[in-house]
Amino acid sequence: MSLCAMASFSDAHELVEIPVIAAYLHRVIHPAQSQIWAVIRETDSIQRIVYSMANTLLGRMCLSGDVTNLSEKQWQAIDNGIDFYKKAAAVIRDGETMIFGSRQASLRHPSAYQAVVRYTDRQSLVVVHTFENGGGSDVNVPVFPVLMAENQADEPETIDLTGIKVTAVYAEPCSMDKDRISLENGRLKVKLQKDFEAAAILLERKPAVDKTKK
């Protein structure tokens, strides 16, 4: 990848396993160089559109499909995804990745859920997808994994986990009731009710206060 600016992450442009492939490729292709395609069909439900658009948060967003035949409601879901992507662009470009969820026995037929945490010292992007039998899963992930590891190790008083807040959410509107997303002690809890559903949450952390300065 040092010889080119970008590459298409896979030929799997319309399949449910896209988020699994895209996340695993973080090990070999920088997300800013990995083109993730959201192929939108005029028959797609809003749930499916959000699922496809959330895939693109694992790399460089690309859009195709029946884009000239979509309804206003379908385009609203796409526009919301584009707006969210712009807010998350910096952490996609500059962050590090950790993947949580069930180990997949088959990449072609994923099950349960996957949660990808992409983070810097100031921002965190959590992208959750449910797969077959994944609806109702209780997702519980650290939003700043390295900071939490430090917090449990040497000098916990130097790591401030209290200044974390959710700044944006992208999901199917009916799936993100307030009781389905919560943040406590640096961990984000998300509960999606249906199989093949997705949600993305962007968080920010205030810089730690230097207690040695007066």
Task: Give residue ranges: language-model regions.
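Structured loops at beta-to-helix junctions and adjacent beta-edge loops in soluble globular domains
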Residues: 59, 66, 129-131, 204
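Aromatic- and carboxylate-lined catalytic core of secreted/periplasmic carbohydrate-active enzymes
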Residues: 59-103
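C-terminal accessory region downstream of the catalytic core in glycan-modifying enzymes
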Residues: 163-175
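Short, exposed beta-strand/loop patches in secreted or surface proteins that constitute
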Residues: 115-118, 177-184
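C-terminal beta-strand-rich structural cap/linker in extracellular carbohydrate-active enzymes
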Residues: 180-214
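Hydrophobic, well-ordered secondary-structure elements that form the walls
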Residues: 56, 126-128, 169-171, 201
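Glycan-recognition surfaces
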Residues: 1-69
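Carbohydrate-binding surface patches
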Residues: 105-164, 197-200
